Amino acid sequence: MRMKKVMITAFLVLVVLMGKAQVQPTTTLLGSWSGKLNVGTVSLTLVLHLDQADGYVLITLDSPDQGAKGIGTFKEYLSDDSLAIKVEHLGMTYRAKLKDGKLDGTFAQNGMSFPLVLTRGDVAKPKRPQMPAQPYPYATEEVTFRNEADSATLAGTLTWPVGYDKSSKKKPVVVLLVSGSGQQNRDEELFGHKPFLVIADYLARQGIASLRYDDRATGKSVGGKLMNATSLDFMRDASAGLDFLRLQKKFSKVGLLGHSEGGLIAFLLGARKKTDFIVSLAGPGVKGDTLLAAQENRIMSLSGLPANMTVEQYRQQKEVKENPWLQWFIDYDPAADIKSTRCPVFALNGDRDCQVIASQNLNAIRQLLPKSKKNLVKEYPGLNHLFQHCTTGLFLEYGQIEETISPEVLDDVAKWINGLK
């Protein structure tokens, strides 16, 4: 689950700063340099930019695999064939010398050092072969709906199935897509991937409509508090989306598809209002503190670090106590809401998800759901939190993987929805 917490790693922290290296007005090292930082089983792409402006050379660092751009650096030394920079807030340094046309150096952070060779040129734009290309064979409609309780207006895209539009007399099934934690646009975009766009496109080609929306105060959505907001606030946004779809009187069924925190929100709603079905993509099935302690230990273990975090130790961390969203989440146990959900549920996860551990959460959901032949709980081998085929499941891989979402998952979701009677 892409939780609003700081994952403890030995890698770059996502902090954006700006800094100028005050040096001679030119250097032969001007331009972009890129390479891979190999740390154990993880490979992290780094890009160094040296740009000249107003008699200064500005040096910034990108970490595209982490979604970080423009990390400012402070110059310790810079010449035509060598450089030394640091990012003090991150405890990071890089010292390199030009050798055979490459910057051959050492990257160090928090007492650990690794070789890092950079070659001229920026990294190529990542390939995303599942990205839908226009013109689409289906109709789309820009819509807004209102959460009056929180004074929030949510903007989104209603995607009609192939052969349908708002004038059609036949009523298709529609799915409201609810994103994971953190403010995201309607496509749930991250690292160049647009999972919700890919899902909406696939569903439309299988006869299923969908509505995806920008999270409150994001994209074209306006209003609604963010300060001190919790999943209950975001639940009301999704609830307004369900109401909007039902008021159209254009759909035979109105269901929810939630990813990560969106799966939690789906069960919150499933226990409280009419919902025709739920698809929970890597949604929680256990109490928040239990989930996050397990998440922390899985990430630490995969990173080659000690994995001995207890639930109580997690709860005592400073960032937990100072974050209202996180405080609500660790105290929330979804058991009662899952037990009270009477609609059909398809709960799925990948066995390499290191954010919402599949075995822990799917087993809980399976035991808690009311008995129904329509329910399906499935664990997919080799898939991560985004349902990509992966190596380790660590979040640093997300942007490096070309696949946005497993075709098997897309097919299973569409077939399950279409199989509901």
What are the residue ranges of the model-derived segments?
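N-terminal cap/lid segment of alpha/beta-hydrolase-fold proteins
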Residues: V123-K170
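Alpha/beta-hydrolase active-site loop
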Residues: P195, M227-Q248
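Accessory cap/linker subdomain of secreted extracellular hydrolases
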Residues: L268-L269, K273-S340, Q355, K371
